[in-house]
């Protein structure tokens, strides 16, 4: 397949491009500078994406967006989080809709943050949306993909959970503390963490290129855990204690209250119902299996 990818230099994008190329696909990257071979230049802020450059494409995968946990949520960064998703998605979806030879599938990024903090409730793709900042961002983000589906292109909304990889994200940030025996649960540890290994994240995305699935798909492992379970499992895998709970005031002072709450002290108990129904077979269905594989323990 000829596959165009935005966000190819990101944490998920790099691994995805590598696997797709290993499997014989022709991958073309969207870049915001002068394009080299195997690249297409675009400028989302200026609304520039040449539809003719996408002709002959079998699939488009859209993964770009400002990092949720990269900076404190100032009003300007909140706007960047939103617009880096909505403007880019709108441009790609509308460009696809205008093409003479449209791709067969559009896989567009989203996140399980769309459900908001929900306590013990088990959440699937048909669950209602939440009312938090991230829920609002995700809802608008998904809405901008609609022109592609309205034009008859199979559109999948990739509601990604916490992606585990030692190369970046939450696991990379926590690992040094746990290796020193300084890890601990956040607050009471009862908040749910719906995680997925990087191998299953990219495996599921590749699976969805051809699976007969459209609409929202939760990209999470089938066995979410509480933060206390995550903490004890990671400590066991690295063979270090993790006795000291981390009180809310410390992360909130560093990250800001809203960001700390969203990333550390609230969560969602998400089930990948659509992915399971599609026949995808998880490489790492449980957390301990995933961590031992990722950390080579």
Where are these regions (language model features)?
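Alpha-helical substrate-binding/gating segment
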Residues: 175-183, 191-225
């Amino acid at each position: 397949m000829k596959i165009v990818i935005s966000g190819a230099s990101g944490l998920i994008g790099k691994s995805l491009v590598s696997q797709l190329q290993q499997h014989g696909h022709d991958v073309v990257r969207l870049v915001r500078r002068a394009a080299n071979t195997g690249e297409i230049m675009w400028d989302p802020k200026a609304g520039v994406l040449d539809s003719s450059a996408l002709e002959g494409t079998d699939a488009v995968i859209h993964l770009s967006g400002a990092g949720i946990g990269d900076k404190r949520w100032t009003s300007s960064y909140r706007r960047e989080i939103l617009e880096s998703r909505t403007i880019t998605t709108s441009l790609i979806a509308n460009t696809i809709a205008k093409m003479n030879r449209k791709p067969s599938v559009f896989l567009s990024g989203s996140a399980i943050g769309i459900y908001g903090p929900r306590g013990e409730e088990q959440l699937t793709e048909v669950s209602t949306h939440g009312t938090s900042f991230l829920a609002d961002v995700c809802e608008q983000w998904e809405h901008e993909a609609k022109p592609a589906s309205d034009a008859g292109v199979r559109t999948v909304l990739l509601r990604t959970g916490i992606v585990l990889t030692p190369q970046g994200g939450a696991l990379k940030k926590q690992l040094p503390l746990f290796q020193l025996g300084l890890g601990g649960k956040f607050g009471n540890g009862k908040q749910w963490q719906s995680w997925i290994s990087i191998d299953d994240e990219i495996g599921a995305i590749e699976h969805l290129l051809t699976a007969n699935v459209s609409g929202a798909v939760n990209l999470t492992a089938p066995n979410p855990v509480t933060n206390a379970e995550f903490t004890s499992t990671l400590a066991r895998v690295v063979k270090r204690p993790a006795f000291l709970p981390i009180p809310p005031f410390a992360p909130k002072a560093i990250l800001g209250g809203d960001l700390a709450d969203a990333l550390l002290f609230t969560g969602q108990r998400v089930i990948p119902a659509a992915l399971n129904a599609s026949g995808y077979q998880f490489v790492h269905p449980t957390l301990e299996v995933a961590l031992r594989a990722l950390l080579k323990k």
